[in-house]
Amino acid sequence: MLSAALAFNSYALDITHEMGTTSFETTPKKVVALDWVLTETVLSLGIELEGAANISGYQQWVAEPHLNADAIDVGSRREPNLELLSNIKPDVILISKHLAAAYEPLSKIAPVLVYSVYSEDKQPLESAKRITRSLGKLFDKEQQAEQVIAQTDQRLAANGAKITSAGKAEKPLLFARFINDKTLRIHSEGSLAQDTINAMGLKNDWQEPTNLWGFTTTGTEKLAEHQKANVMIFGPLSQEERQQLTQSPLWQAMEFSRTDSVYELPAIWTFGGLLAAQRLSDHITGRLTQPQ
């Protein structure tokens, strides 16, 4: 009996997160994630989720890693269903600081850990690595966590080398998501795109101030100042959006349009973690090294 008690107590684990330190006496099994980047990170460790926020949105925008089919949709990322969460009885709930207002009510349901990949630090890739290690410790998946981190570093470096050997590394990149025909978001400092291409040895042509998510909202006319860049458009664009864009006289006049230096990327969660960075890197590499 004594040896069993000692064994039980020896597992007690303190996890430090952005709103304190939480103790666990056993490895959490029923896990709920209310932020897509945390959903992605948990799944990357080979752990299935008991619940996740806005599952249809995750499947559309994040896509990989695939969410287990029996995961329960617990409501939106901004307003999770507290009653449903109470019924699930999770062992741990994972949120980002952007949901900090819900910390107290959620803490009445289960221990809550707060991790933010995107913040004023503007180092999402390093933050994602730190969080991956912390969750690896929590779920007794430390070896898997290190494998995910090493795989990310290796993939980004290898893709960068592939682009360099293809002679495509000198031309700077510009990452844009179109909001409408007059407005777009351009991703640079503090974005997943910026940290990913930094690790690949590539350059970003956009150097304007960004918000904590790593993008600048601006007018499409600003593209005229970046005509020598390879333009990466975050998709997917609808046929109507694509037609509206390509038929615009302004767009047609741009040097990057005339030199076929515009590339549409598939749905990639631009506010994701390490696996999202791998996917983004793969698609950038595929676009830049494909035969013209």
UniProtKB/Swiss-Prot annotation:
<feature type="binding site">
    <location>
        <position position="269"/>
    </location>
    <ligand>
        <name>desferrioxamine B</name>
    </ligand>
</feature>
<dbReference type="GO" id="GO:0042597">
    <property type="term" value="C:periplasmic space"/>
</dbReference>
<feature type="binding site">
    <location>
        <position position="213"/>
    </location>
    <ligand>
        <name>desferrioxamine B</name>
    </ligand>
</feature>
<dbReference type="GO" id="GO:0006826">
    <property type="term" value="P:iron ion transport"/>
</dbReference>
<feature type="binding site">
    <location>
        <position position="215"/>
    </location>
    <ligand>
        <name>desferrioxamine B</name>
    </ligand>
</feature>
<keyword id="KW-0410">Iron transport</keyword>
<comment type="function">
    <text>Part of the ABC transporter complex VatCDB involved in the import of iron(3+)-complexed aerobactin, a citrate-hydroxamate siderophore produced by other bacteria. Binds the iron(3+)-aerobactin complex and transfers it to the membrane-bound permease. Functions in the import of iron(3+)-complexed vulnibactin, a catecholate siderophore synthesized by V.vulnificus, in the absence of FatB.</text>
</comment>
<feature type="binding site">
    <location>
        <position position="77"/>
    </location>
    <ligand>
        <name>desferrioxamine B</name>
    </ligand>
</feature>
<dbReference type="GO" id="GO:0030288">
    <property type="term" value="C:outer membrane-bounded periplasmic space"/>
</dbReference>
<dbReference type="GO" id="GO:0044718">
    <property type="term" value="P:siderophore transmembrane transport"/>
</dbReference>
<keyword id="KW-0408">Iron</keyword>
<dbReference type="InterPro" id="IPR002491">
    <property type="entry name" value="ABC_transptr_periplasmic_BD"/>
</dbReference>
<dbReference type="InterPro" id="IPR051313">
    <property type="entry name" value="Bact_iron-sidero_bind"/>
</dbReference>
<dbReference type="GO" id="GO:0043190">
    <property type="term" value="C:ATP-binding cassette (ABC) transporter complex"/>
</dbReference>
<keyword id="KW-0732">Signal</keyword>
<comment type="subunit">
    <text>The complex is composed of two ATP-binding proteins (VatC), two transmembrane proteins (VatB) and a solute-binding protein (VatD).</text>
</comment>
<keyword id="KW-0574">Periplasm</keyword>
<dbReference type="GO" id="GO:0015687">
    <property type="term" value="P:ferric-hydroxamate import into cell"/>
</dbReference>
<protein>
    <recommendedName>
        <fullName>Ferric aerobactin-binding protein VatD</fullName>
    </recommendedName>
</protein>
<dbReference type="GO" id="GO:0019271">
    <property type="term" value="P:aerobactin transport"/>
</dbReference>
<comment type="similarity">
    <text>Belongs to the bacterial solute-binding protein 8 family.</text>
</comment>
<dbReference type="Pfam" id="PF01497">
    <property type="entry name" value="Peripla_BP_2"/>
</dbReference>
<feature type="binding site">
    <location>
        <position position="118"/>
    </location>
    <ligand>
        <name>desferrioxamine B</name>
    </ligand>
</feature>
<dbReference type="GO" id="GO:0006879">
    <property type="term" value="P:intracellular iron ion homeostasis"/>
</dbReference>
<keyword id="KW-0406">Ion transport</keyword>
<feature type="binding site">
    <location>
        <position position="185"/>
    </location>
    <ligand>
        <name>desferrioxamine B</name>
    </ligand>
</feature>
<feature type="binding site">
    <location>
        <position position="271"/>
    </location>
    <ligand>
        <name>desferrioxamine B</name>
    </ligand>
</feature>
<feature type="signal peptide">
    <location>
        <begin position="1"/>
        <end position="12"/>
    </location>
</feature>
<feature type="binding site">
    <location>
        <position position="61"/>
    </location>
    <ligand>
        <name>desferrioxamine B</name>
    </ligand>
</feature>
<keyword id="KW-0813">Transport</keyword>
<feature type="domain" description="Fe/B12 periplasmic-binding">
    <location>
        <begin position="30"/>
        <end position="292"/>
    </location>
</feature>
